[in-house]
Amino acid sequence: MTFYNQIVDKGRLKKLISWAYRNYGAARSSQVADNLKDLGFRYATKAGVSISIDDLTVPPTKRGMLDSAEKEINITEARYARGEITEVERFQKVIDTWNSTSEELKDEVVRNFRQTDPLNSVYMMAFSGARGNMSQVRQLVGMRGLMADPQGQIIDQPIKTNFREGLTVTEYVISSYGARKGLVDTALRTADSGYLTRRLVDVSQDVIVREIDCGTRRGLKVTAMKDGDRVKIALGDRLLGRVLAEDVMVGDEVIASRNQSIDAALAAKIGKSVESVMVRSPLTCEAARSVCRCCYGWSLATGRPVDLGEAVGIIAAQSIGEPGTQLTMRTFHTGGVFTGEVAEQIKAPDHGTVKWGKGLSTRKVRTRHGEDAFQVELAGDLIWTPTGSGKKMTYSVTPGSVLFAADGDTVEKDKMLAEVTAAKSTRSTERATKDVSTDLAGEVFFANLIAEEKTDRQGNTTHIAQRGGLVWVLSGEVYNLPPGAEPVVSNGDEVAEGTVLAETKLISVNGGVVRYQPQSREIDIITASVLLDQAEVRKESTGGHEQYVIYTADGQRFLLKATPETKVQNHAIIAELIDDRYQTTTGGMLRYGGIEVAKGSRKTGYEVVQGGTLLWVPEETHEVNKDISLLVVEDGQYVEAGTEVVKDIFCQCSGAIEVVQKNDILREIIIKPGEFHLDVDPDEVSYKNEDLIPPGTEVLPGVVTTDLRQVEWIESTEGLGLLLRPVEEYPVSNEPAAPSQGSINEEEVGRHIELRSVQRLFYKDGERVKSVDGIHLLSTQLVLEIETGSEQAAANLAADIELKNDEEEDCQRLQLVILESLILRRDLDTDPHGGTITTSVLVTDGDQIAPGAVVAKTEIQCREEGEVRGIRRGLEAVRRVLIVRDEDLEIITLKEKPTVAKDDLIVAGTEFAPGVVAAESGLVVAVNQGEEGYEIKLRLARPYRVSPGAILHIADGDLVQRGDNLVLLVYERAKTGDIIQGLPRIEELLEARKPKEACVLSRKPGVCQVEYLEDESVDVKVIEDDGTVSEYPILLNQNVIVSDNQRVDVGEHLTDGPANPHELLEVFFDYYVDKKGVYEAALIGLQAAQKFLVDQVQSVYQSQGIDISDKHIEVIVRQMTAKVRVDDGGDTTMLPGELVELRQIEQVNEAMAITGGAPARYTPVLLGITKASLNTDSFISAASFQETTRVLTEAAIEGKSDWLRGLKENVIIGRLIPAGTGFNAHEEMVMGTLDNGEDSLNNRYGQGERDNNNSDKKPPNRLIGATLDEVDENMILDDNIARAYTEADPPWSVESKQEKDDDDDK
């Protein structure tokens, strides 16, 4: 046993047990674990470690650290107030300051514990890995730190207290957002993670170790995994449990040979001596439909080569899916907080000077905190020389680093010299915006700011700051004027309190009689009205509902159609005459006699223009719609009244029958009354159908008409007959009578209102009306007519219907009035910036006013005295007025002559004269010289810095209220690492989705030319090796990460952002297909995509501190990259668009090459895990996953067979699964091939005799019996020995096994 003398924490414990297991097998290590457990419990019991509140000690230096942070922030705030930095830069600086303070405090907490109380229970728990971690301890005894608001934006006030000190109410509320978010998140995460595992299992369930060695010479190049300069996974850790694909040479010495498996010692040795190693990998394994033992390497459960029949696919799926719950799912946008882990900071060790080395070229930049600095374009050295004696220091700076000291500058101790950005790290930026609102009301003034108009495709114009500059807001009280108010003062007027600034007049357009109740909000003006002065209105109720009836003086009754107290439009029907003169008893045919109607519609009726007679030929119509067999009479038959014509239907009058039928369905029966004459010779009668015969005419010999008749010839059952149908006449007058009405009309306005009487017919000339009970032919209506100068105006006018009480006769009369309603605005007092508002009404009830008269006026009065400014009379109405009050001005008296002049804008801190400094920013209004000296009048103001490209919400000279938005600053912010993390990113990768903002990849190798254009866009060209120049369009929000004259390789990133794996595959395939042929190019392309996916998935898990072995991810990625899409089948049987395994199509193509047929052409494809699952060979497995119906119908149509190779299809059918012991069936088929190569392989693994697949080499039987007798029950059996204790030979020997195979074959 080796002796360890160090503190054993959780990680150490893991290592200890793993060491015991590796060297002494499972039985011994389980006993070690058991003993450790006893030891642990014994000491835990003795120690009784628990946390009491006294254990939470806050480091004493905390106060000082917070003070220095606040001091730094105050300096920043002052710079912001002076307009030196923008809102964004202030925010960034505040956030960064608090972030670094929080980090320093965390380190201080650890230091404090270590030095003062190393046996502190909190410290022991957190650092032994028992419970809790640093970030939790920090919240207990450090500071809670910055929190995000519900939108994910960081709040720039951190929680400075910790849980030991306790939170204030505000802090508690702020901190509870994050807490709730965490709970919700965990719930969502579990579900997502479970679904991911399910998909992974489905895609990889049929990956089983089926062979010992596929014999491939291919391999995967493994290097340490880095992010910039930081090593995420060391090379040694990545190699553990892999098998080498090539010998590893150090100089001339071979330190490890091909096909050797790498244990911990060898891994460490290789990791120290070489940078990269070729290893066997599931990705390059050539075993058909499985993975071979050499390519997979160790089974991580046992630390030995994997057994045959091991279901490595399922192990891989669970290894990737299970930690999914630990990944943070929804990532919080941290509002641009960017911790300084990317940039390494160089601080001056002491007082000294800075020199730039040769070849260092820079350009001026403004840092994200608004400081001027230099960005390195070509790398070089930064040399620091101490002022006194001391050693020179040389720092190498990379392109993209920021220098804070110019060449030759003298620097203080701890001054920041540079921020060196790590070599290409996965740092990306995004565009973000921030609103800047004003802190005071006043007048906007642009200083050195040029606004430019941009119009987008939709025609919206935005104003953008072309160059950066300052927006000043000059202080003053701003009054919002209500709509329609006109200012009555001008710029420069001096006003006192109560002076009227503006007034709104309420004007009547038409004039008329005023109706006004005091305290009401409306003033109505009657411009025209009409009264039915002779008629009275009574309320009657018929059939359960009430209605109004108008009784006129001459005895007519009109039914009121419009409800009182409502508005009606022009030409609306107000009332309808109640009369039954035009009521028929049956249906029939209508003919006009001399009547003319205006155009109209069936709904509203046709208005009678010229009177005359309505002629009505009655007939009785029954709509039946029954089977023809129910008909009792025949077509043309003459029946008497009361006859049954169809079963259960009787006619009401005598007449000739007409039957209308269609497809043996009886549609309708018509009974036409009249005199029916048979045995008539048609040649003797000169009348045709529908002719009208006047009274007293002899139609037939002996038949004379007594009244008006209409002729109709009928084919009856007894022959041809003549029917003389009666015709009823209804006279219609030219002008219907209208009731008497008196009206007041405004003649000047040209408005006239009256009720006109109109007659309307509802049926056209010659129309047949089907009815049994009769219809109403004509109705008389009262219609509202409003006449104005123009037709357009009349259409929009409406009249109010009112019932007016007549005092003398004690009844109600109908009155229609046209009102002009004017609303008094009494709600204006609610606007805090509106000034004092008074409204006065200038009319009383019953006044007669002329058009254009002012009815009421509202005055806006000034609240304080001052001078009027900011009225710009132009095209638009004046909406705001500014008053410069005394409190907006500051008077400064000086003895000496000031250095400032009138109209100068000065920021706080500027000198007016030697020794006199401005306390506030402002505009110099006047400089006066008096007897005592000079007097400067300063109008207070606030400058706001605007960065280039910001969107301006205001124009020069606008008036703004406090809190109005001035500009929208557009800035780039670093995406924090956590945005592209967690489950969503894993899912995006494994489903092979295209990322939202993919980066641009170079399609061929060459040299870059990068050009930054005027409009902030970047032009990137690559001059390829054959001289071709290709352009790469760069979108606005993409950042170029290559520099001018940099050499790029095929598939290299030109801009930031995640790569699109599909594009990566395509780029490599297109580049190599002409050089190396389709198969090789497909392999290279797929390998590039595979490497990308494995590394990306690893980096997500690594960033969360989860270790997963590469081989698991490789098994899954192998399934995603196994297929190609056929483009052209050639002479093979494959169809275009079919997905086929790469190896399969290549075998077919090799056969084609031998027979001379045309090979199939194909493109490699990358399938997401869901797609790959649905495209497996086994349709049973695919159908049990998703889209069952589609998969099964397709399989049935195509006549597929399922070879039951995977686990899932066998489980569904209920067979033994081909993994573990069930694998023997498969093993027997390949047994013959294993016999010869067995020894060498097992010895190569250093296992020889104790290989668990070696079934033939068994010790003789008697050894087992003899040994077992001596086994002591207290003896600990080691695995390695236990393997020798195999059971007695199975019932069948090797020969019998052979016979069994023969039987199977039969």
UniProtKB/Swiss-Prot annotation:
Cited InterPro entries: DNA-dir_RpoC2_beta_pp, DNA-dir_RpoC_beta_prime, RNA_pol_Rpb1_3, RNA_pol_Rpb1_3_sf, RNA_pol_Rpb1_4, RNA_pol_Rpb1_5, Rpb1_funnel_sf
Catalytic function, reaction form: RNA(n) + a ribonucleoside 5'-triphosphate = RNA(n+1) + diphosphate
Family classification: Belongs to the RNA polymerase beta' chain family. RpoC2 subfamily.
Keyword check for Zinc: yes
Basic and acidic residues bias spans: 1247-1259
Gene3D superfamilies xrefs: 1.10.132.30, 1.10.150.390, 1.10.1790.20, 2.40.50.100, RNA polymerase Rpb1, domain 3 (1.10.274.100)
Pfam hit, one: RNA_pol_Rpb1_4
Subunit relationships: In cyanobacteria the RNAP catalytic core is composed of 2 alpha, 1 beta, 1 beta', 1 gamma and 1 omega subunit. When a sigma factor is associated with the core the holoenzyme is formed, which can initiate transcription.
GO molecular function: DNA binding; DNA-directed RNA polymerase activity; zinc ion binding
Protein name stated in the entry: DNA-directed RNA polymerase subunit beta'
Co-factor remark: Binds 1 Zn(2+) ion per subunit.
Annotated Zn(2+) binding sites: C214, C285, C292, C295
GO BP term (any one): DNA-templated transcription
Cofactor(s) annotated in UniProt: Zn(2+)
NCBIfam families per UniProt: PRK02597.1, rpoC2_cyan
Protein purpose: DNA-dependent RNA polymerase catalyzes the transcription of DNA into RNA using the four ribonucleoside triphosphates as substrates.
Top EC class of this enzyme: transferase
Region (Disordered): 1234-1263, 1281-1306
Keywords associated with the record: DNA-directed RNA polymerase, Metal-binding, Nucleotidyltransferase, Transcription, Transferase, Zinc
